Every structure is written in structure tokens, then in C-alpha cells.
Amino acid sequence: MVCHPRLPLIAGLDFGREAVYVWDASDLRTLGVVEAASPSDGRGRGPAVAWHPEDPVLLIADGGPVRCWTPAGVSELTKFPTGYRNVAFGPDARTVWAIPTVTDGDPWECSDVVDLESGACGKGPGWDTGVAAHPAGGLVLTLRSNQGATLGIFARAGDGHTVAPRVLRRALILDVDGYETPIFSPDGRYLAVRGNAYVNTLDVFEFPSLDNVLSTTLGEPSPGYPYPQDWLDRMRAWSRHNIAFGTRPGVLWIGTPTGTLVEADLGNQRSLAHDIPSGAAVTALAATASGDLVVADATGELVRLAASADRAVASPAAVTDFLAGTSDVDADADLESQLVLTDGARTWEPGDLETVDTATDSDPTWLRIQVQMNHAR
């Protein structure tokens, strides 16, 4: 589920049917259903959606024509290029960032920046896993995935100088691939990343420090390859879309396959489980613009849980501090050679990883591979 950042609207993605539902967040009334416009690519990927920053406008991309839902109905953006699998509104709401690129660029290295009215297409930096905007504005976070490691790429946005995001040198590095779009807390003090391709991980970082305050595996840790089928079944019972920040500062909610919502207090490092009304497995969890939690379960039921407090307002100071501690990359040079990487505990300046010569079994896969490559040189 993807909630509108300002209005009481929810977009629900049905990957089995390859359809998008639009609900009124105040009473969970269905406002529309948008069926897939193109056949499945066979990878189990459903449509991607993006809400307009202010208006009741939803873009739907599924590899065919990009379509637009409004309260008046569904229309096709006929001036847009076709073939996009993911889209995001730029902060000015007049441009759309889209992947994969349909220009002559390398799909890994660049994306498209499309004018919403004319369909005119320019180039932006590469990304592959959704775009998360900091609630105070001026900064976005997206992912660049690789089987060995995934980079969390930060970029300036909405500063009036360019419609494309401007990539910054400071970046996150996550083990392996297969992550979902990151989410920021309403007050902008935390960001959470749900993953990954091999096990159910959850990482939460403070912002702007990027210190890791929670790194855990949901359910049982991996028993190692080859994976027993019963472990795979239990692992796959967890929804990949089961986290949300509510109104209480520093609290992350986690939906479970046993019909509970876990209230995780990041500051006190404590958690408390709450039963959902149906007792069925949580299949999706999101927070509305007002801070209410919306829970979808395995029975198909949708429940809204009222917020217990007013939603916090993010301060621009955190973004200002983050930007002051980094700089733009040179768009004409190799990206990865310019990045200052952190995993939330350690930091590597450009060139540092080429000299790392030791790693333990507890280190992430990407770091152990890097050490092996350094020894082979």
C-alpha cells in the first residue's frame, strides 16, 4: 500500500491480479480499480505507483503506457514514452522520474526525467527501487541494486537549479540485493529499509547521522544453502510491505504472519505485540497522511487504526545538516569511485575498500568478496 503524502488516499497493489486499488483513507471506500495495461514480464513484479505531491493524482507504470488515475477516472498519458516499470514525481510535480530509460543511455547508469505536460525526455541518475522523499523536502533516497551489494543513493531535489535529482557523495551500503523502497519517519529522524532477496531483514538508520539503530532478521535466520523447504515457506509468509512509521516519534510498526503488529520503540530498544482484529497474517501495512495505520490481512480485510497523537512535522534542519556534510558527485565521472559509504557502523572514504585485507564470517557478503578480490590482485 502507498498512501498519499497529503490527502486521505491509499493505493493498494494486488500483485496476483496485477491491479491497483484506490481507497478513501477516511472510510476505506473503493474509489477505483486500475487493471494492468500490459502482460506480466514473468518476474512476479506488479505495477508501480506514484502519488502527486499535492493533488489527487496517481501514476501507474507496469511496462506499458503510463496511466493516470484521478477522481474523474483513468487516462493514458499519450505524450509519455512507453515501457516504464517505475515512476516518481519530482518535487516540482511538473516532472516525473522514470525507469528503465527509453533513451540511448545505459539503464544502470541513468534514468529519464519526463515533462508531465509535453512528454519531453531528459536524463537523470540511475536508480532501480523506488524513490523516498524526506518529509522536510530537498532530499530523496533511492537504491541501486547489485547481487553483491546495494547502494542507498541520496540526491538533492527541488532546489530550483535542475529538474533532475543531483546525486550526493554520502551513501549507504547494504548487503546483497532485493530491497524495497526505503521509508522516512514523519519527523524525518529515521529511515527504514526492508529486505532482502535471501532473508527478511530490517534496518533502521538515524538521520542525518546514518547511524544504524536497528538491524534484525524478521523470523528465523537463514540456515544456509540449500534452504530447507519448510524454512522457505516460513520466510515467504512474511510480507515484504509490512513496516510503517506511525505518529509516535521513534516508533516503527511491523506486521507479522501471525496476525500481530509489533510496536518497536527505537529509542528504548523495546517492542510490544498487538493483535489485529482478524488475527490473520498481515499482508501490507502503511500510514496515512494523518498518521493512521492501515492494515491489510490474508483474509482480504482492510482495517484503519486511528492515530494516538498528531503527526510530527519534519524540520528542514536535518536535511540542511546532511547537505552540509556532503557534496555533489561529478556526473561525468564514475559514481562508485566518488562515494563515501557507510553501513551505519563503519565508513569508507573513496579508495578505502581497495586496501581492506581482513573480514570475518560476521561481515556482510559484499565486504568478504571485496577482501577476496583484494587478495587476488
Q: Could you say what each language-model-derived stretch is?
A:
Residues 2-8, 48-56, 88-95, 132-138, ...:
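Blade-terminus and WD-like Trp-Asp/Gly-His loop motifs, strongest in beta-propeller folds
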Residues 25-27, 70-73, 115-119, 156-159, ...:
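Short loop/turn segments that connect beta-strands within beta-propeller blades
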Residues 1-2, 42-50, 81-89, 125-133, ...:
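Repeated scaffold domains used in trafficking and secretory/extracellular systems
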Residues 35-41, 165-174, 216-236, 325-329:
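Surface-exposed loop and turn segments in beta-propeller and other repeat-based domains
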Residues 11, 59, 97, 140-141, ...:
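Structural core positions within WD40/WD-like beta-propeller blades
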Residues 18-21, 65-67, 104-113, 147-153, ...:
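Structural motif
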Residues 29-32, 75-77, 122, 162-164, ...:
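A structural motif specific to WD40 beta-propellers
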Residues 282-342, 347-376:
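Blade-level signature of beta-propeller repeat domains, shared across WD40, Kelch, NHL, RCC1
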